[in-house]
């Protein structure tokens, strides 16, 4: 099978590869939803086995943090195929290709998610399941959007913690989902050809005053909380700051985006949508025989 990845590179991939290495959680997520267990995966934070993958990553060879995978450990896993996040691996393309056929996806925007899932499902020999997963998500997104209150549009922000928080434009996968539910993203849309995120100072945040803030949890270090402006934000005062799991960071996979949809709905409209049990939702999508 010959495919074109998000680098625009044409890759000859083996038929029904059995030994999948995942750089980022995207391919791990897709593989699990297809009933396949990868042989190697990166992590977001060492020792943090994400609930949206049912903690199953601890049974898989860990090959380092997603931004700096260890190529020696990757090679030891003897993969048939490597599925990677483009921006973290494009500089190592040559070394990766020596280990196994290397496929790179952007994994950044909701508009790319269906295509990435369907192509990877095809590569992994389960194209019908990929089509089903995409159709189910589109249906769920429409149902949740229809059920969301129409008279409120909570201002929201999705950010990586830091002294100057990095915030995500509306096309980014999680922000797209929150916006589809009626949220109003203070970071606004992407500029044509620009990046999918932007640095917003706490001063700017105070001016735009988000009512709900989703923070990608990079661990116990939360420098933004030490800034006196932080305490003045509406979201902080009303207790609507949510430190979210790794599925929000890696939301393009079928399991992650379904759970983000449910959590976002609950966090925006707690009266309308129930609290989410992440593991229970994940278990609906991960076949019993690989758990």
Protein language model regions, located:
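A short, structured surface patch at a secondary-structure boundary
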Residues: 19, 25-73, 77
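Binding-cleft/active-site segments that stabilize strongly anionic ligands or cofactors
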Residues: 52-110, 145-155, 161-162, 166-249
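Short, solvent-exposed loop/turn elements at domain surfaces
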Residues: 11-13, 28-33, 47-51, 164-169, ...
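Solvent-exposed coil/turn segments that connect beta secondary-structure elements
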Residues: 6-8, 16, 25-26, 36, ...
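Extracytoplasmic/secreted envelope proteins and their assembly/folding machinery
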Residues: 14-17, 24, 28, 32, ...
């Amino acid at each position: 099978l010959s495919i074109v990845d998000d680098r625009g590179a044409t890759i000859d991939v083996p038929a029904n590869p059995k030994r999948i290495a995942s750089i980022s959680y995207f391919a791990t997520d897709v593989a699990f939803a297809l009933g396949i267990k990868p042989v190697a995966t990166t992590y977001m934070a060492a020792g943090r086995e994400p609930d949206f993958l049912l903690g199953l990553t601890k049974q898989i060879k860990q090959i380092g943090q997603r931004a700096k995978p260890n190529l020696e450990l990757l090679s030891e896993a003897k993969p048939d195929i490597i599925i990677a996040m483009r921006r973290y691996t494009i500089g190592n393309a040559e070394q990766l290709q020596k280990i196994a056929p290397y496929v790179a996806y952007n994994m950044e925007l909701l508009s790319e998610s269906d295509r990435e899932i369907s192509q990877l499902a095809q590569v992994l020999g389960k194209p019908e399941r990929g089509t089903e997963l995409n159709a189910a998500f589109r249906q769920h997104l429409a149902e949740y959007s229809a059920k969301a209150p129409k008279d409120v549009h909570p201002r929201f922000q999705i950010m990586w913690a830091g002294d100057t928080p990095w915030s995500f434009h509306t096309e980014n996968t999680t922000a797209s989902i929150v916006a589809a539910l009626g949220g109003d993203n203070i970071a606004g849309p992407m500029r044509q050809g620009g990046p999918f995120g932007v640095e917003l100072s706490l001063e700017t945040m105070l001016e735009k005053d988000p009512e709900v803030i989703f923070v990608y949890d990079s661990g116990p270090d939360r420098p933004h909380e030490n800034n006196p402006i932080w305490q003045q934000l509406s979201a902080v005062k009303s207790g609507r700051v949510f430190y979210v799991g790794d599925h929000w960071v890696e939301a393009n996979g079928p399991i992650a985006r379904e759970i983000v949809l449910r959590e976002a709905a609950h966090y925006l409209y707690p009266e309308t949508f129930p609290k989410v049990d992440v593991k229970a939702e994940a278990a609906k999508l991960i076949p019993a025989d690989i758990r």
